[in-house]
């Protein structure tokens, strides 16, 4: 009986740790996505591209609300994007747009960012297998948002 309780507690702790870790990575991903969209919006010329980006940004924000509720349940503050990754993204965005301020360039940058996000989120989904289903669902929803935006960007490439 004692071994079962210890094992059960160990499993519970593992689930909670993986859940929090996955939620943190999703939090950083949502923030990075919103920030990246914000960085390019002022350069957008096409109303269709502006609408696609704005709609996706709103979906990121809705998902962030659900994410913050789950993080609050675990008394966790979440995670900001890696400062180095964020500054490198900002530099790449601004350098490319200074050289070629076009919707094509914006679509290219957003596609690259989404692909990196999808890759990272799938890695974390595989790494934190013990995470609860709610956090896995949030992660999958974020992956779908990124994949959908990539598809929307194709017409501007």
Regions found by a protein language model. Name each.
Residues 65, 69-108, 112-118:
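Carboxylate-rich helix-loop segments that flank metal/cofactor sites and access channels
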